[in-house]
Amino acid sequence: RLRCLSGHDAISFHMSGTEAVMQAVRLARYHTRRSHLVRFAKADHGWWEASHPGSGDPPSPRETLTLREMDDKTLKTLRSRKDIACVIVNPVQALHPNAGAPEDSTLADSGRRAGADRAAYAAWLQRLRATCTERGIVLIFDEILVGFRLARGGAQEYFGVRADMVTYGKTLGGGLPVGVVCGRADLMRRYREDRPADICLARGTFNAHPYVMAAMKAFLDRLETQPIKALYRGLDRCWDERADRFNRRLHERGLPVRIAHLS
């Protein structure tokens, strides 16, 4: 069922979203034989220093590039360099490209801004997809934060763009610790045909833990029920109407607050 939902051939199971991201990047580097990871400004990909350099972390990794989303200069960089193994995207950034996700400090700040332009972000992802394909760069969607909130097929379905690898996390396990990587079969192999002994390991004592797998099965079973399928069919209309109604009430009461949403 994960193959069907993600549209990918192979699956691996881990114990957290961060581990899933680490494995996806590791496999991308292994198969492309390139060194560099590209992430986008302010995007959250867990606590691994390679995907989250900054304050409170060790010195920024030399093999991580932080670029801007929805920027032609980023595509130019991807086309000009020969050492980029993968680009990782957190689709929740569609609400606030190149700005940080909400946290305690920003939620208390009246200067917080967000807004979603689905068509513009989808167009950006399509251009990014085309550039990655052209340059042999692995495109990774990190869907751990968005889960399956946007669509039954996740952000790939919602934005109409197919990534080479996708990571999922806590949503699948109903809150239990889980990380999942779905990807093309050629990228998910732990060995290379020309050097079969050069293995790309991904070990974990609790990977695919039976308790977590059972919780995941319960979630996927629920996803297949008719009421949930019906809910997904009306998701955009439902949340557009709710947001409009809520924003009208905020406006009527003279409150300088508006809500932004994706789905």
Task: Name these PLM-found stretches.
Residues 226-263:
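Conserved PLP-dependent catalytic core of the aminotransferase class-I/II
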Residues 3-116, 237-240:
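PLP-dependent aspartate aminotransferase-fold enzymes
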Residues 90-122, 136-159:
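Conserved PLP phosphate-binding loop immediately N-terminal to the Schiff-base lysine helix
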Residues 204-235:
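Structural motif of enzymes handling amino- and sulfur-group chemistry
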Residues 31, 129, 134-135, 253:
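Helix C-cap/helix->beta junction micro-motif
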Residues 11-18, 41-44, 145, 167-173, ...:
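Active-site nucleophile and cofactor-binding loops and adjacent substrate-binding regions
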Residues 159-191, 208-215:
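Active-site PLP attachment segment
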Residues 2, 24, 37, 64, ...:
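Buried hydrophobic positions in well-ordered alpha/beta secondary-structure cores of metabolic enzymes
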